[in-house]
Swiss-Prot record:
Name the record gives this protein: Large ribosomal subunit protein uL14
NCBIfam families reported in the protein's UniProt record: rplN_bact
Subunit (UniProt): Part of the 50S ribosomal subunit. Contacts protein L19. Forms a bridge to the 30S subunit in the 70S ribosome, contacting the 16S rRNA.
GO biological process annotation, one example: translation
Gene3D superfamilies: Ribosomal protein L14
Length: 122
């Protein structure tokens, strides 16, 4: 469950390390984002010479959450951190690599490029 003011790790190689959620882009009045939801975020920590700088406002898709995700078969999955991948306006990843596992729910939401770049899909 990601809400405004939540800090997330960045799971790609765009140069950002931490982002802070500003807005959840899901419906008109959504309070929380979960895996596969798009958020608007501000870059709070970045490495020098990266594709994004501190203070940039970016769109990102949530790929891991500490709050468990319940699946239709009754199982649940949760991760050790909250993480996102920075995307462009066409919902394609801006980076060329994705670090760490991502949830299977991304495939159902149409983020196939992120799923194919990820080393592991859980």
């Amino acid at each position: 469950m990601i809400q405004p003011q939540t800090y997330l790790e960045v799971a790609d190689n765009t140069g950002a390390r931490k982002i802070m959620c500003i807005r959840v882009l899901k419906g008109s009045n959504a309070k929380y984002a979960t895996v596969g939801d798009v958020i608007v975020a501000s870059v709070k920590e970045a490495i020098p010479r990266g594709a994004v700088k501190e203070g940039d406002v970016v769109k990102a898709v949530v790929v891991r959450t500490k709050k468990e995700i319940k699946r239709p078969d009754g199982s649940a999955i949760r991760f050790d951190d909250n993480a996102a991948v920075i995307i462009n306006n066409q919902l394609e990843p801006r980076g060329t690599r994705v670090f760490g596992p991502v949830a299977r729910e991304l495939r159902e939401k149409g983020f196939m490029k992120i799923v194919s770049l990820a080393p592991e899909v859980l």
